[in-house]
From Swiss-Prot:
Keywords: Acetylation, Metal-binding, Phosphoprotein, Repeat, Zinc, Zinc-finger. GO terms for molecular function: zinc ion binding. Positively regulates lysosome peripheral distribution and ruffled border formation in osteoclasts. Involved in bone resorption. This is Differentially expressed in FDCP 8 homolog. Residues 77-116 are annotated as: Disordered. A zinc finger (Phorbol-ester/DAG-type) spans 199-250, 429-489. PANTHER family: DIFFERENTIALLY EXPRESSED IN FDCP 8 HOMOLOG, PLECKSTRIN HOMOLOGY DOMAIN CONTAINING PROTEIN.
Amino acid sequence: MAILSLRAPGPWQAMQVWADRTLLTPHTGVTSQVLGVAAAVMTPLPGGHAAGRTREARWDAMEYDEKLARFRQAHLNPFNKQSGPRQHEQGPGEEVPDVTPEEALPELPPGEPEFRCPERVMDLGLSEDHFSRPVGLFLASDVQQLRQAIEECKQVILELPEQSEKQKDAVVRLIHLRLKLQELKDPNEDEPNIRVLLEHRFYKEKSKSVKQTCDKCNTIIWGLIQTWYTCTGCYYRCHSKCLNLISKPCVSSKVSHQAEYELNICPETGLDSQDYRCAECRAPISLRGVPSEARQCDYTGQYYCSHCHWNDLAVIPARVVHNWDFEPRKVSRCSMRYLALMVSRPVLRLREINPLLFSYVEELVEIRKLRQDILLMKPYFITCREAMEARLLLQLQDRQHFVENDEMYSVQDLLDVHAGRLGCSLTEIHTLFAKHIKLDCERCQAKGFVCELCREGDVLFPFDSHTSVCADCSAVFHRDCYYDNSTTCPKCARLSLRKQSLFQEPGPDVEA
């Protein structure tokens, strides 16, 4: 209770009145208004009658209560995240209206300090929100937004031209939206150690003894004391603290949707075209005068800083197809990962890129002949039950394009040709396939041919080295017999005569 004296209150008595009211009334902090009220109370009252002094003291107390009520409604708890509004001054006896968060704070009188407790608390990281929404409400809102974005992306894909770059980008965007939606629907999946960032799918590594280098900060990853992740798509390795600093998307998406090589040998454009900055992280680089050394990538021809170019060595596809040069050259980290993912993809059509290569590299001619024979053997295996049960075609599962065409090559194929490995392995597979067709399987033997020109010799097959195949009817002949008869096919002549007889023979309606 406030102690009111009948005498003129001195400074200490006024201070006691203010302190009692402060203790009896909880508030959030001391502001300029409260300090002003305290200063007014501490001012000695003039002399006069006891009744007059009592009325003045009561009036001051009522005025203080009104100001304190307005102060409470004008300020929020400083531990809330959002700073509260302040109301306009109201006269005595007026009803205080509700204050909405949209109302602005009034300006304080000159000379009074600003009240900034909420901001200071937020800066210190001490703010709390005890009235936040449940996690499920945020999840439902995000799921609804993702579903709406997926539907809009579908509509955009249907409206864009077929096989256009914008349509491909929209398809990639749709895939990422679906993955994000699936992650939100299954937040408690069995793989909590996977993080998706910029098309990277990082998996938390469990190895503690293998020493690796972070691809972001270019420092050693100490597995015993540091957490690190590896991208399952491009094998990008980094510390857990460096995940949010990654700015380059995963190159596996580029391999999936734009699988092609740069076939110009070191297409340099100069540092001025890069604005004297790293082609990947945009850090300032130069050939001299700056701490970061400019390093050129032999694949892209661009310049990189020492953090993005570690002087890694790789075989350049353009030098292979044009010069048959397999010497490793220095490339950037991004090009290194891209070439590593592309090494087994058959995207090189050598006959169109460099047709003279088959004239100078004999191994390529042998490989092409073996691939053509395997394509001729494929129909036998598809229609043979024993071959399908034995899964003979799986002998080429590492090079699936060998059973699809004889024109496409991968960089790994050319590396194996240069090393002499591909010719030996392909010859063994060719021998195994021919043995099944000509010796082991009676059904495949029954599908052989007899030379209709000489009608002598063994059963012929289209993949035999001494045979020729008619381009029109696929009949097989001895090579010498076929060219001695001026490449005329008796089967084609017989089929043409049969067609003519069918057209010339009159029907029963014509004779009647």
